[in-house]
């Protein structure tokens, strides 16, 4: 009956006739819902909640998403892995997730089975129900640039255990009055321009750049773009209006047509003024090197070979053990993502240290801080100046020491200049 009806309806229509229906296929068949097969999700997808009509029929009610309207047979249909939309069920058919088998303890067999020794020697499988904190912490550990090789251990009796996911309760009278000593939070306006990519939005006829998170207009002029120069092997940017300042006190490398000219050293600006990079590396001919955590005073680190004697290039081969200091190693140029990662770890570490500031004596704190950075530096990423300056000054940083630029500021990373 169905078939003949369909055939009758789908005769060749004359051009002026409206198409009143879509010829249906026969009923489609799916796997049994109890098997790991298909099930309907987000059933009854309506764009807006429709008003319930007061009179007349209520229309077809959406079917229960658990048991979709199909004649279940053993046939398996051909469908893409991600599922497909079914208008009849108002929802997507998706492959069912494999159900985890319930654990059934093995029945003891008198003859075979595990001996006590087997039981004791096999590792125990423990399942811990993850809490949001533990998940966050696990992710942080996975993503962190620290490796377990040289653990930074803090002595337990000195430091209270700090749950980083709760705010520390510290007595207010101990807190220093610092303008920006609040720790960084998600979408912190102080770091917005470091993190978010500006999005062009049309306002009238003008197109302006807008921060997608805070929605405020960028200070950049879209037509002329950003006027800035890349100044070192890290790809650090100095904005045009700061270039003079940068040139006043810094080693500059200019690369044109693949010729590396000699860098010229410029006189140092007055102490106390700000400049775009905190570190001055007085270097002769090594093109890409940066001061690193290794430039901290030697009493804070294990005394290895302190003499910084660069190897001669001819000398360098697999057999010769080089006595180069670790800052001599040419720096890998890291991607923006890696750089953001280092920056994230850095800010985290900084905030932890700042929180512990009142609980430990300064020496331990300083040592811990430096150890952290020696760890990160093993990954051989280049640090921009604002990260290293606090290390060189040998103190745990506070905001006066590296001034992260504010929301609408054009300057690149800025730090107090300790000449």
Swiss-Prot record:
- Ranges of biased composition (kind: Basic residues): 1-27
Top-level lineage group: Viruses
Spell out the residue ranges making up region: Disordered: 1-29
* InterPro entries according to UniProt: SatRNA_48 (IPR035312)
What cystine pairs are annotated? none
Signal peptide position in this chain? none
Q: Which residues cross the membrane?
A: none
One Pfam family name from the record?
Answer: SatRNA_48
Query: To which protein family does this belong?
Result: Belongs to the nepovirus satellite RNA 48 kDa protein family.
Tell me the protein's name: Satellite RNA 48 kDa protein
Annotated source species: Tomato black ring virus satellite RNA
């Amino acid at each position: 009956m169905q078939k003949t009806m369909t055939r009758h309806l789908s005769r060749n229509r004359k051009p002026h006739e409206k198409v009143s229906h879509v010829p249906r296929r026969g009923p489609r068949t799916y796997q049994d819902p109890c098997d790991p097969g298909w099930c309907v999700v987000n059933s009854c997808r309506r764009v807006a909640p429709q008003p319930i009509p007061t009179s007349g029929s209520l229309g077809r009610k959406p079917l229960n998403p658990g048991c979709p309207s199909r004649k279940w047979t053993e046939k398996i249909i051909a469908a893409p892995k991600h599922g497909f939309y079914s208008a009849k069920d108002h929802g997507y058919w998706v492959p069912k997730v494999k159900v985890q088998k319930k654990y059934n303890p093995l029945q003891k067999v008198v003859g075979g089975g595990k001996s006590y020794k087997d039981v004791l020697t096999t590792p125990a499988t423990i399942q811990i129900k993850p809490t949001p904190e533990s998940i966050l912490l696990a992710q942080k550990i996975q993503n962190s640039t620290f490796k377990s090789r040289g653990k930074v251990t803090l002595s337990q009796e000195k430091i209270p255990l700090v749950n980083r996911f709760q705010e520390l309760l510290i007595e207010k009278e101990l807190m220093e009055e610092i303008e920006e000593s609040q720790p960084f939070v998600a979408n912190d306006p102080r770091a917005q321009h470091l993190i978010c990519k500006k999005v062009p939005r049309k306002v009238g006829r003008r197109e302006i750049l807008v921060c997608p998170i805070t929605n405020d207009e960028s200070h950049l002029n879209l037509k002329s773009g950003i006027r800035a120069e890349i100044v070192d092997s890290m790809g650090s940017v100095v904005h045009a209006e700061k270039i003079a300042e940068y040139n006043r006190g810094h080693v500059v490398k200019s690369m044109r047509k693949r010729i590396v000219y000699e860098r010229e050293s410029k006189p140092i600006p007055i102490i106390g003024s700000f400049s775009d990079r905190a570190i001055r590396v007085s270097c002769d001919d090594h093109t890409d090197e940066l001061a690193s955590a290794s430039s901290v005073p030697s009493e804070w680190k294990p005394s290895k070979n302190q003499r910084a004697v660069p190897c001669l290039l001819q000398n360098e081969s697999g057999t010769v053990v080089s006595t180069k200091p670790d800052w001599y190693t040419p720096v890998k140029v890291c991607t923006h993502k890696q750089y953001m990662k280092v920056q994230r770890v850095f800010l985290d570490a900084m905030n932890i240290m700042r929180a512990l500031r009142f609980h430990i004596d300064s020496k331990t704190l300083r040592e811990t801080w430096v150890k952290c950075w020696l760890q990160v530096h093993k990954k051989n990423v280049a640090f921009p100046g604002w990260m290293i300056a606090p290390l060189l000054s040998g103190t745990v940083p506070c905001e006066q020491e590296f001034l992260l630029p504010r929301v609408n500021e054009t300057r690149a990373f800025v730090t107090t200049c300790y000449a």
